[in-house]
Amino acid sequence: VGVATPGGAEASVHAVRQLAKEFGDDPGKIMLKVDFSNAFNMVDRTEMLAQVYEKLPSLYRWVEYCYSNPAHLFFGSCVLQSVAGVQQGDPLGPLLFSLVLHPLALKIEAEFPNLDLCVWYLDDGTIIGSVEDVHKVFELIQRDGPARGLHLNVKKNEIWWPSRASPDPFPADVDRVDNAG
């Protein structure tokens, strides 16, 4: 969403609003807003390099040069080794992060073709569908994300549930957004 399209990111906002109107109080529908912990700083560099090699081979040597060895970070008299994530300020950072996330997003779409919406803007995801499917997507992300350095920040994920007639399968620390606002 939003790449090379003026106002492209807003399309997901409008889609969410429209789906919320359409589903109204349907107890079988739910929306999950996904949040990853420290997303850009935690992506697995081995996975990132593999994705660059596969998808953007012309950039591979440069990205490998920049990310195949730990970067030295100076903190006072201490030198820290940065071994994960993309470097702050790297103009390729959003692209590299997206390359790591993309296979997970494709897996979600393949395994859950009946989702009403599955949209990502960098590390922000919005998933709308049946309670059962969205819960299974949540579990898939928890299971498959860490191998890519994508760890759900469960306390910052949000659920919007128009009507809670169904049992709630999500962990208690996932935030429930009040339907009133």
Give the positions of each predicted feature.
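Short glycine-rich loop/turn motifs that provide flexible caps or phosphate-binding loops at active sites
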Residues: 1, 7, 84, 88, ...
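Short, glycine/acidic-rich hinge or "gate" loops at secondary-structure transitions
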Residues: 1-6, 116-118, 154
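Residues in well-ordered beta-strands of folded domains
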Residues: 2-4, 74, 160, 173
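Short, conserved micro-motifs composed of acidic
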Residues: 143, 153-181
